Amino acid sequence: MEYERRGGRGDRTGRYGATDRSQDDGGENRSRDHDYRDMDYRSYPREYGSQEGKHDYDDSSEEQSAEDSYEASPGSETQRRRRRRHRHSPTGPPGFPRDGDYRDQDYRTEQGEEEEEEEDEEEEEKASNIVMLRMLPQAATEDDIRGQLQSHGVQAREVRLMRNKSSGQSRGFAFVEFSHLQDATRWMEANQHSLNILGQKVSMHYSDPKPKINEDWLCNKCGVQNFKRREKCFKCGVPKSEAEQKLPLGTRLDQQTLPLGGRELSQGLLPLPQPYQAQGVLASQALSQGSEPSSENANDTIILRNLNPHSTMDSILGALAPYAVLSSSNVRVIKDKQTQLNRGFAFIQLSTIVEAAQLLQILQALHPPLTIDGKTINVEFAKGSKRDMASNEGSRISAASVASTAIAAAQWAISQASQGGEGTWATSEEPPVDYSYYQQDEGYGNSQGTESSLYAHGYLKGTKGPGITGTKGDPTGAGPEASLEPGADSVSMQAFSRAQPGAAPGIYQQSAEASSSQGTAANSQSYTIMSPAVLKSELQSPTHPSSALPPATSPTAQESYSQYPVPDVSTYQYDETSGYYYDPQTGLYYDPNSQYYYNAQSQQYLYWDGERRTYVPALEQSADGHKETGAPSKEGKEKKEKHKTKTAQQIAKDMERWARSLNKQKENFKNSFQPISSLRDDERRESATADAGYAILEKKGALAERQHTSMDLPKLASDDRPSPPRGLVAAYSGESDSEEEQERGGPEREEKLTDWQKLACLLCRRQFPSKEALIRHQQLSGLHKQNLEIHRRAHLSENELEALEKNDMEQMKYRDRAAERREKYGIPEPPEPKRRKYGGISTASVDFEQPTRDGLGSDNIGSRMLQAMGWKEGSGLGRKKQGIVTPIEAQTRVRGSGLGARGSSYGVTSTESYKETLHKTMVTRFNEAQ
């Protein structure tokens, strides 16, 4: 049965060709009543088109606002075909008005046309594993859809009903996602593209997801994924036209397969272990010469991008389980506050940078890439906040160094584990790679302390064995060596066949079992040991048989430095007796506080030079500095000595003032004093490690003055000369008799605590690069002030100490200076009263609050004014003296108000006292009662 189109509101007003339609419509159509049984007033989403194009809607216009994972395309083939067919029709699609008024329209179409459309949809729709259900009832839920799936024996991966965000009501369509395309196709064919849910027919369509490659683009320079509207890369700033790279979604530039023998590795990264090399994949990012290293933002946190909005914590942990042991405390999924769905990224925080770098390298080396819930994951280092980026340049350099070496350490650990854990270095035909840029001169390990020094070491690949610097085929390691700095001074090196260092008191001695446990490489190949300088004779150890170690030569014997592998802190062994860490590869002892190495054989302190890749004695740079300065002239010496004496006196005065202020404090005086005889021998030893530790702290104040400065300090020789007279520290008191003696003996004693030639403070055991730094240390350092006070108290006798403590206790008490001043000068006489200018005025004091208590006198201003007009005292006012004689007195207001209130007062005035007022009140009440 064919239904005629009824005119809408626009047709009645003649908006869209009402005149033409009046010729087709008969009179009975205009007079026909509405048959509401044939009408469908449901407000489900529908599509309609108009010639103007301003009312073209499709299903995706309502789906895209709430859909996050299933982004339907705005124009599918079926919808475009329908639009073309509707445009060719002269009157538009049957059953749809042109003006948008569809309250009294019939939405049913002919059966033949509907079947034709269904056939076209079946032919033109592209199969997908996501099925869209349209025309759902308002009361339908996800459970109803799952019930339909279970009735057909189909297991769906996810069912999502689209709802209005504000009201929460169903929008009439839903999505069903299947794990496989075959399941979705089988379900569509079994139901003939329609379902019956809650007694209503529901249409089924394949979802046409929007290709995301048209939305985002990848930068072929840095590999960062950018938004579609971004015209240039937000990381490297390359324009989109130059840097756009058509790659599948989720594919990263650093995940492309490179040839196994490729040399284009990112600086600071080592090849992956053998299992990944077998697959032909190198986990390194190909960076251009101008690009920044990938370790710039390295930290202990990894970010996972391009996550499915419905991915949960369990799915992420399950996907990462084969690569790392993580818990829910390590993973943080960022969710939307309104929808409670994740925003497409998550963070993984590990305990150290090494673990994070290791996991990052593994995940980026996967082929195919990591996939979670059907989406390819992009893995990168997480960037810090803006306030973290605002750090100074020195800390950034140090952080970059630690991050680079951490990545190298992670890769080296993987490679060592894959090779069986024999502890041998990997042999290779390619030349050794230079990683000396890890060791920054000023930033290396200065601000990170002990923890950073554990990781801030590079790992060298390509050498024949640990510590081997010779050419291939030369087992003795005596082959030609290339120096990194041809013009640099040489340091003596000597190779020996077995590492068997001698032991000193408190120094670790390697046993024969420990030597043999290092593998066969330690026996067949040689180590290279530095010959450091002697710093202190007290550190000399008892002689032990050490014939395997030849005597060291002078530092100027060679012109090139022997190169060593970068120290591996993880292989060090802790020695409880000395407190140092023993390096079994080089036989040196490592101090983590100062980062110095100690050679027990030559009793020298060494430090690691990253540029030369060798161990340099601590005295080398200071000796060079003295050679360059040369011998000063005679006039320069005199000026220097004069300036030195003047500076010492100023420092002595400053320390004297500080000592006086220190006497006011009671705390830690007894604990700070320790006799010299009670100190242990090891506490009295001078150590260059303290110099390096203080240089790290001193670096913040004078960074420019401390470049390439050796932290050398000779020992304090015992002085056999008689000590100067001992006296008390000058106290803050004008009655101290020993103040003058202390002023004479103090500067001479303190002058001996400073070595102006070597620019060292012998009291604090510190050496400085310039005289200004030494003076600043003596004036401002709290450590120097504390050591100076301890040094002064150490030279006092017991009686002097008791007197000093007694004086300190007296100083801690309250001192009544006013009483002392009164006793000394007496009590001053009170000042004389001031003389008044006018003697005629009575000096009697008048209470300003009660001036008329005794009555009005004749000296007031009112009386004088009346007398000026002819009035005399005692007469009445007026022309004929008929007025009042006595002045009007002020009376208290009537107490009380309303009915029953007395009409008179008790005769009490405001000038009466409380006692007089009470007396008058009692008398008045008594009289009234009678």
UniProtKB/Swiss-Prot annotation:
Residues 1-14, 21-45, 98-111, 623-639, 653-669, 700-709, 743-753, 815-826 have a biased composition (Basic and acidic residues). Residues 129-209, 300-384 form the RRM domain. A zinc finger (RanBP2-type) spans 212-242. One of its GO terms (molecular function) is miRNA binding. One of its GO terms (biological process) is positive regulation of vascular associated smooth muscle cell apoptotic process. A zinc finger (C2H2-type) spans 759-784. The modification Phosphoserine is found at residues 61, 89, 718, 723, 733, 736, 738, 781, 797, 845. The keyword Ubl conjugation does not apply. Residues 858-904 form the G-patch domain. This is RNA-binding protein 10. The lineage of its organism: Eukaryota, Metazoa, Chordata, Craniata, Vertebrata.
